[in-house]
Regions:
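Extended recognition/assembly regions associated with phosphoester-bond processing machinery
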Residues: 1-53, 58-221
Length: 221
């Protein structure tokens, strides 16, 4: 009878506009594709109690682009119709995300629900080490796995799950289609705690939201 929570990895809204400003014409398809992806997820899981955004909601560090504002407002409306509350965990790109906020929306450095803590992963907080907290759900690292058949290699975003220092940790991939992610087989994920993920499981979400288990990071060739 617990809460039903959808945790969402780094969105990096405003990425297209940042590229367009730099002269890389990428159009405006990305946001509508993102909404389609979310529609597919909600079709499968139904309404939730809360949506938790795990930080780096916006892409451009320290400034607010018009497109970001517009997209963010639409996204909050979209989520607002499908949940009771939205929690935004601040990421390293989100220094000024506060003024976007509307009713039923909170901004936190980290967010604790029962024994689960949602946080970005770029900063440490003493509260997250309390004994009652058994699980961390984190963003920031953008995990992905690169698989090669000898001819071509493809990169797939993945979830990582495992135990470290007595905590169960789930690392959530970036939700942005432009962010390919960092290959977990090539070393450090950039999380503030320097987590050793070699024994963590790699889970890739495939077509029709089917979950594929690739086993432990350290055993993948």
């Amino acid at each position: 009878g617990g809460k039903k929570i959808l945790a969402v990895g780094d969105l990096h809204l405003g990425y297209e506009e940042a590229l367009n400003i730099q002269g890389v014409g990428v159009g405006r398809m990305l946001f509508s594709e993102m909404i389609k992806d979310f529609e597919e997820i909600f079709d499968k899981i139904g309404k939730v109690d809360e949506v938790v955004l795990l930080g780096d909601v916006k892409h451009v560090f320290g400034s607010v682009l018009q497109q970001e504002k517009e997209d963010f407002r639409k996204l909050l409306e979209f989520f607002g119709e499908r949940c009771k509350k939205i929690v935004i965990v601040k990421g390293n790109h989100d220094s000024i995300v506060g003024f976007f906020i509307r009713e039923r929306t909170e901004v936190r450095d980290f967010y604790i629900v029962d024994s689960v803590c949602f946080l970005h992963g770029d900063r440490d907080f003493k509260e997250i080490w309390e004994e009652k907290i058994t699980t961390w759900i984190v963003g920031h690292a953008h995990p992905a796995i690169e698989l090669s058949d000898g001819v071509k290699s493809e990169r797939y975003k993945c979830f990582l799950g495992g135990k470290w220092k007595g905590k169960k940790i789930v690392v959530v991939p970036s939700f942005s289609r432009y962010s390919e992610g960092s290959d977990v087989l090539r070393g450090d994920l950039g999380l503030v705690w320097g987590v050793d993920v070699r024994k963590f499981k790699v889970l890739v979400v495939g077509e029709k939201l089917k979950v594929l288990d690739f086993g432990e990071v350290g055993k993948i060739k």
